[in-house]
């Protein structure tokens, strides 16, 4: 493996040849492994602590082979030197030494985690996330870029901070620059949860680096469960409370949405008394806009917290009406299925 990466395995092959003409005795090879590799295994009588491989005697033109398997544990240039000695006259000492070098490219082991400040969040309130990017080395992680992937309809006004004090609006990506080996960077996020959101909200972060040999966990996500905190107030009044048969009664209904969250699927139900009122001829308006005939109920849809809707209902009192008119309105929503009355 002449182009190993960090933590790869290398197999060194050492061949000793007696070129003759005489027999060589007590042949010994010295190969003390360099820093940057870790001994895994070998063939032959090799001692990794001393670097000595005792070959013994070699006849003329006889050879012996040693294989050493190591693991790369650092980056950069790693050179392995070897030499051989033996008893007897050696007419050529220039070939008793050899070396081989490998160049291990820069490498990083990165990890990113994302944790929410709470796994249960109320719609309409703020959620916070803490993102930690760690470089376990061995090299510097250069040009680290962090991206937060979120649904802009669920999380509003997303901001980030590198110190928890100074906040900036998030815009597509954050350039974290270089992260040294053994160091980490913490990024804080905060956003307002849309008041109309319910259920799980998934948020994902990922990182990239310009280091070619990058490993580890480059992405993480966090899911929070969004619940509602809503109130519905309904107020009903009559414009004139003293009326006669044949007059038109004007009911005024005001619906107010409160709480931290928006009220979803608000429905107003007002059944007029057909024995006292001309139900078929009743009309209504919403926030001052005439809507036509009143059929007994209306879907107000989603109401933002802090907003109000006014519904006016007009109906003629029948000529046969002979008693007081009692009228009740009920307003329901997803969070208040039983409704509130007035």
What are these regions (language model features)?
Residues 1-342:
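Exported/extracytosolic protein signature
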